[in-house]
């Protein structure tokens, strides 16, 4: 989908697809694969488009919590004259991530360690404890979920994270939305044949 924003100095590239619900057995691995690919500042796509190429101030993906199928969403605001090149880079990064350049042990370990270290801060207030209880009820997680979460995070295997990426991210099923100055970007984007 293309949405015109005449005179825009940047384009916002949005890409996403439906994935498994928050109650899925591999929900932690899905979160880890998301963070390696595009969910954190040091993720592959952000490092590529922001740090290596300087085409974007920052990209980010997310897996919002949901009882049913939930979206994997990536947002990449990029400079207008690099819109098509950025789309190609995102396509390449995703294809390689589920193909011949999956998450490395170092990338996975970095996310696991960060998630474990963040645990104490997740339960500092009454509101955060209440939120954790609400999540357990909403998603059908066991009563000992909070107590066992550290062990669950640490138990994620590299192969399980890579399998979550392959089962969750299917490039041919992704929906693309680009918002920008169509006078400048429409023709080259249409040549990509995104959908």
Q: What does each model-identified segment do?
A:
Residues 164-167, 190:
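Short proline/glycine-enriched turn/loop segments at secondary-structure junctions
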Residues 10-21, 30, 46-99, 105-158, ...:
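M16 family metallopeptidases and their MPP-like homologs
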Residues 185-194:
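Short, aromatic/basic amphipathic alpha-helical patches
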Residues 1-42:
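His/Glu-based metal-binding/catalytic segments typifying zinc-dependent metallopeptidases
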Residues 180-184:
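A short, acidic, flexible beta-alpha connecting loop/helix-capping segment that sits on the rim
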């Amino acid at each position: 989908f293309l949405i015109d924003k005449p005179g825009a100095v940047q384009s916002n590239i949005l890409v996403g697809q439906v994935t498994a619900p928050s109650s899925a057995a591999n929900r932690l691995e899905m979160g880890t694969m998301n963070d390696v690919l595009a969910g954190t500042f040091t993720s592959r796509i952000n490092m590529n488009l922001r740090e290596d190429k300087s085409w974007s101030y920052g990209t980010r993906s997310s897996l919002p919590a949901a009882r049913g199928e939930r979206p994997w969403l990536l947002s990449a605001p990029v400079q207008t004259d690099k819109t098509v090149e950025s789309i190609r880079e995102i396509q390449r990064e995703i294809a390689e991530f589920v193909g011949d350049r999956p998450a490395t042990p170092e990338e996975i370990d970095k996310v696991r360690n960060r998630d474990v270290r963040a645990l104490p801060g997740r339960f500092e207030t009454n509101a955060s404890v209440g939120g954790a209880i609400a999540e357990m009820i909403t998603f059908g997680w066991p009563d000992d979920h909070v107590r066992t979460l550290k062990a669950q995070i640490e138990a994620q295997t590299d192969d399980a994270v890579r399998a979550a990426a392959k089962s969750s991210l299917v490039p041919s099923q992704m929906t693309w939305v680009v918002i920008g100055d169509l006078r400048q970007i429409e023709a080259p984007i249409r040549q990509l044949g995104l959908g």
